Swiss-Prot record:
The gene is LSM6. This is U6 snRNA-associated Sm-like protein LSm6. InterPro entries: Lsm6/sSmF, LSM_dom_sf, Sm, Sm_dom_euk/arc. It comes from the Eukaryota. Component of LSm protein complexes, which are involved in RNA processing and may function in a chaperone-like manner, facilitating the efficient association of RNA processing factors with their substrates. Component of the cytoplasmic LSM1-LSM7 complex, which is thought to be involved in mRNA degradation by activating the decapping step in the 5'-to-3' mRNA decay pathway. Component of the nuclear LSM2-LSM8 complex, which is involved in splicing of nuclear mRNAs. Keywords: Cytoplasm, mRNA processing, mRNA splicing, Nucleus, Ribonucleoprotein, RNA-binding, rRNA processing, Spliceosome, tRNA processing.
Length: 80
């Protein structure tokens, strides 16, 4: 039996390797390159900067290595 990708699955597959925003329920916004994502919305990113609520609020932290975000904390993912 052949499975079909959902619209959200296609979107997520298409943005791997691209710049994205990932916002957590805590209000922290991560901006960086999406390296991987799984079915639980666990996210790995590189070249990441961390902001509170919006990019305009300034950078809280820049990460020199990859960042892992737990899917249960992800509010949304958007393409930059």
């Amino acid at each position: 039996m052949e499975s079909k990708a959902t619209a959200s699955g296609s979107f997520l597959e298409n943005i791997i390797g691209k710049p994205v925003y990932v916002k957590l329920f805590s209000g922290i916004l991560y901006q960086g390159k999406l390296e991987s994502i799984d079915g639980f919305m666990n996210v790995t990113m590189s070249q990441v900067s961390e902001h509170y609520e919006a990019e305009e609020n300034g950078t809280l932290h820049k990460y020199p290595s990859e960042v892992f975000l737990r899917g249960s904390q992800v509010l949304y993912i958007s393409e930059k």
